[in-house]
Amino acid sequence: MSVTLHTDVGDIKIEVFCERTPKTCENFLALCASNYYNGCVFHRNIKGFMVQTGDPTGTGRGGSSIWGKKFEDEYSEYLKHNVRGVVSMANNGPNTNGSQFFITYGKQPHLDMKYTVFGKVIDGLETLDELEKLPVNEKTYRPLNDVHIKDITIHANPFAQ
């Protein structure tokens, strides 16, 4: 199961881990299928750490799950922030997942068991390279020029009715 994020700087194909994180994947895939992420900016970009998106307000403070409320974390000892390209839910503490997610630029073991890992980049690491190179505001880490998710292609959605 995978999706492709079509961004202003290229495509990123992500394998999603539906068996290990079913609720997170149901939320993510439903948001993808409803075009929720279309137009979202990458609002936080920290070189060597991660890039974050998934807030339709573009502020980094918005976004909602498909259930209209925060939902619980799904941790697995098998899913770690151990390579470049790990995809995880952003949160504000335990069990506060909504719509925002991030992609790591490298190993981030301090994030393990704090953020739900639900996917990994399987194609488009060169696009991740382009995102990481973007100049940012040194205080907010917001890219100086907005880069958007234009749209998303879902490849074989197991939750589709």
From Swiss-Prot:
GO molecular function: peptidyl-prolyl cis-trans isomerase activity
Record GO cellular component, one term: catalytic step 2 spliceosome
Domain PPIase cyclophilin-type: 2-154
SUPFAM superfamilies referenced in this protein's UniProt entry, alphabetically: Cyclophilin-like (SSF50891)
Any matching Pfam family: Pro_isomerase
Catalyses which reaction(s): [protein]-peptidylproline (omega=180) = [protein]-peptidylproline (omega=0)
Function: PPIases accelerate the folding of proteins. It catalyzes the cis-trans isomerization of proline imidic peptide bonds in oligopeptides. May be involved in pre-mRNA splicing.
Annotated family: Belongs to the cyclophilin-type PPIase family. PPIL3 subfamily.
UniProt-recorded name of the protein: Peptidyl-prolyl cis-trans isomerase-like 3
Gene: Ppil3
